[in-house]
């Protein structure tokens, strides 16, 4: 990749940012030398790594690689059998600890970096041994070996003895007058006392040092010379034992040189990958879609070196209908920034970095990128001359091909406008004919006309607000830039007569061209305003639609709650009424009743039902849409569903005039409008024989037994249908004093049998029930015995 272009497009400023996110020195060095790649497979692999690292950061946060020390020199020494010092062994422990932390922190998942994580070798035994033996760079643990512990214990005892002897001298009345100070000190590793110089002959011992004034001598008392010698001997033994411990640890580390080296390389690579992910997160960048077709389609691209609160995103595309894009517009209007944005984002993408643009932005892979940009807008370089521009251009024309991207800033500038425009058109046309993807900025109208009249070339402009005299930095592809010199001059107060004189001096063709461009600009602005209004209306409609939908959902929820509560209340009332009716039937069967007594009980039941009905204070629930039935469709014995109560029953009477039918629900009988009924099946209950009173006895005799079967067949019914039919059948059978009945429900999935069993448990007048035995129908029937 062209190094000059990397510098011109400020790629190294991106790598400087990238380096700041790396933790270890090895990763920083690699990232500082990062260069764009030209193989799309390698690029996509690096982008996959960045993407997967970013995903892991979002899920579990980042991890610290700062303990990844460069152990390559230490490993090389281990390979030849050398012993490592304390610092080197601590670095190896740090590498192993970091490997374990990274491996444990990021759980297993299949992605582009999972293989690296799996290949990390933690070598726990070695790491534990190093940590056990070494406390810090200055201290070896007593637990490193039993011999070291013994030596240090002896050394401690010797220290205590020597301090005891010295303290005796300090407290001795004889020697106190000889001492300059009452402290114990060390000189040359030996314990001494500070003695006044004039008493040196009176204080037996060895002189090791004196004060700067010479008034104090540091004398090792004769009484502790042997003890000092003992301590010195123990110190030498301690040092020798430490060397043995370090040699032993080094030997153990030497058994894992390949794992240690592999861990270091993997951790450095992971640090690089996670640094790229951190940069992407900081820039709010996204993954580009790479291609080898020369297509660039950047959506809302932002120059990464411009402050996020000031940068204006641009949409820019080329490589499909055209490969040469001419950008025109005022100075400081964003033309050069547009060039640099395309060039820099391409370099970033080819380096495996995410780009500050919207998702699914397309970036082409180029073999080389050439940038001839007059760096008048860079504080680091001075204005280029025409000669230097032309030198760059000659080099570009020699080297560029269809796999390259060429960026020209103010092509043909710095010389006579007529000659400069002609040269620029010739250069651009040559690159177009060779299929080179090219972007160029210019002020020349001739180049705008060339773009308008040449296939495969497109105009673009940087928008300028004449009212505020400020560029908007928006890039508009398909519209050539308009020279705003006259409008700006008038806005700034230049007299009209000068403007008029200048207009007359313009070439007629130039005036016509500028008028066309001006008309296009006005049409574009008008269209954008209309489009903005349409988008505003669409957003308002969407908002209203969302609010209406939310309101309807709340209303539906409220309605459902009302219906649910009403159904619960109705079910409770029905249960209350049925329980009362059951008790009445039980009493009637037990004692027998006169017709008058029966009528009295019937009146009591009706009064209780009326009271229960009064409790229902909710509005009738809205009935869900269903097929409307005509009164002629209803037959006695037909099974129906009462939609307002969500219960099933049997038609016992029909009232055509009122379009109502009487529905029997268990022991409860009530009139219902047919609009609130749904026919469930054409099933008809067997006709019941009319009850007759026994001859003058005044007792009710149940002669229904002649019309009540000892068996009910529920095959083909749903659970709800079966329970409704079973409820009425059992009432009739109990009243008819049939001692035992047989319920046929089949085996099937068991749902119907379970529903029947659950219902039977709540019937008060049932003595017992069981599944059929062999010969009775087995598990396909249930036998019920009444009380």
From Swiss-Prot:
Example GO BP: mismatch repair
Domain Smr: from-to ranges: 712-787
Protein's UniProt keywords contain ATP-binding: yes
Entry keyword set: ATP-binding, DNA-binding, Endonuclease, Hydrolase, Nuclease, Nucleotide-binding, RNA-binding, rRNA-binding
Enzyme Commission code(s) on record: 3.1.-.-, 3.6.4.-
InterPro entries: DNA_mismatch_repair_MutS_C (IPR000432), DNA_mismatch_repair_MutS_core (IPR007696), DNA_mismatch_repair_MutS_sf (IPR036187), MSSS (IPR046893), MutS (IPR045076), MutS2 (IPR005747), P-loop_NTPase (IPR027417), Smr_dom (IPR002625)
Pfam families xref list: MSSS (PF20297), MutS_V (PF00488), Smr (PF01713)
Enzyme class: hydrolase
Source species, domain of life: Bacteria
Gene3D superfamilies per record: 3.30.1370.110, P-loop containing nucleotide triphosphate hydrolases
Protein's UniProt keywords contain Transferase: no
Record GO terms (molecular function): ATP binding; ATP hydrolysis activity; ATP-dependent DNA damage sensor activity; endonuclease activity; mismatched DNA binding; ribosomal large subunit binding; rRNA binding
Annotated residues for binding of ATP: 329-336
Residue spans crossing the bilayer: none
Function: Endonuclease that is involved in the suppression of homologous recombination and thus may have a key role in the control of bacterial genetic diversity.
Protein family according to the UniProt entry: Belongs to the DNA mismatch repair MutS family. MutS2 subfamily.
Subunit: Homodimer. Binds to stalled ribosomes, contacting rRNA.
Protein name per its UniProtKB record: Endonuclease MutS2
Organism in which the protein naturally occurs: Lachnospira eligens (strain ATCC 27750 / DSM 3376 / VPI C15-48 / C15-B4) (Eubacterium eligens)
Gene assigned in the entry: mutS2
